[in-house]
Amino acid sequence: MAKKKIEAIIKLQVAAGKANPSPPIGPALGQHGVNIMGFCKEFNAKTQGMEPGMPIPVEISVYSDRSFTFEMKTPPASYLIKKAINVKSGSSKPSKEFVGTITRAQLEEIAKVKDPDLTAADLDAAVRIIAGSARSMGVKVEGV
């Protein structure tokens, strides 16, 4: 069987368990002729065990015959950091005002979740990547 030709790659961020045909999903998939409800049902089934509402980056490959496959990534580091320190948003002045403090243990936990999507060589490097994200959000980092 010949390999299908990829016609488009669509990158979206969709809330776990809450995919529906309304924007931004509907228009993004509709313009490529993808079965929108098919994607929504499949995505919601795969994210059933996850925390509802957690943003999940998804990469949808659309083939020339209008079929599709999708790959889910790990949640954004900023979401995981905000969840770990229980804040709604980062600081508007990151290096001057701090919204909270995060420990090395919390950073390690986030790094383990993000590991498949990070290019870090080891856990320590992954922790430093996550710590940098935390600092840029105005979170004080302890133990790194």
Curated annotation (Swiss-Prot):
SUPFAM superfamilies cross-referenced by the UniProt entry:
Ribosomal L11/L12e N-terminal domain, Ribosomal protein L11, C-terminal domain
Q: Which GO terms describe its cellular component?
A: cytosolic large ribosomal subunit
Q: Which UniProt keywords apply?
A: Methylation, Ribonucleoprotein, Ribosomal protein, RNA-binding, rRNA-binding
Show the coiled coil region(s): none
Domain of life, per lineage: Bacteria
Recorded hits in Gene3D superfamilies, A to Z, give: Ribosomal protein L11, C-terminal domain, Ribosomal protein L11/L12, N-terminal domain
The known PTMs are summarized as:
One or more lysine residues are methylated.
- Where does the sequence pass through the membrane? none
Protein's GO biological process: translation
Q: Which GO terms describe its molecular function?
A: large ribosomal subunit rRNA binding; structural constituent of ribosome
Subunit structure, per the record? Answer: Part of the ribosomal stalk of the 50S ribosomal subunit. Interacts with L10 and the large rRNA to form the base of the stalk. L10 forms an elongated spine to which L12 dimers bind in a sequential fashion forming a multimeric L10(L12)X complex.
HAMAP family in alphabetical order: Ribosomal_uL11
The task this protein performs is described as: Forms part of the ribosomal stalk which helps the ribosome interact with GTP-bound translation factors.
The Swiss-Prot or TrEMBL record describes its family as follows:
Belongs to the universal ribosomal protein uL11 family.
Tell me the PANTHER family matching this sequence. 60S RIBOSOMAL PROTEIN L12 (PTHR11661), LARGE RIBOSOMAL SUBUNIT PROTEIN UL11M (PTHR11661:SF1)
Protein's name in the database: Large ribosomal subunit protein uL11
Q: Which organism is it from?
A: Francisella tularensis subsp. tularensis (strain SCHU S4 / Schu 4)
Taxonomy-wise, where does this protein's organism fall, top ranks first? Bacteria, Pseudomonadati, Pseudomonadota, Gammaproteobacteria, Thiotrichales
Q: Which gene encodes it?
A: rplK
